[in-house]
Amino acid sequence: MTESTLIIIASNVVTVFVSVAVNRTDISWLKQRLISLEERINKLGEKHVFNVG
């Protein structure tokens, strides 16, 4: 990995941690984020399965 890639990953991680820290009191927000992320992963998985089939 190049340095720029690591910097991008690090900044994304920091952004996520800041978002979580800001919204830590709002658990429903966090649940919604997890649900939407899970749905996105499931959609990607379905596409992958269809492509293989």
Curated annotation (Swiss-Prot):
Regions crossing the membrane: 4-23
Keyword Membrane appears in the UniProt entry: yes
Keyword Membrane among UniProt keywords: yes
Coiled coil region boundaries: 24-50
Localization per record: Host membrane
Main localisation: host cell
Key words, A-Z: Coiled coil, Host membrane, Membrane, Transmembrane, Transmembrane helix
Organism domain of life: Viruses
GO cellular component terms listed in the entry, alphabetical order: host cell membrane; membrane
UniProt membrane topology term: Single-pass membrane protein
UniProt-recorded name of the protein: Uncharacterized protein Gp-k
Native source organism of the sequence: Pseudoalteromonas phage PM2
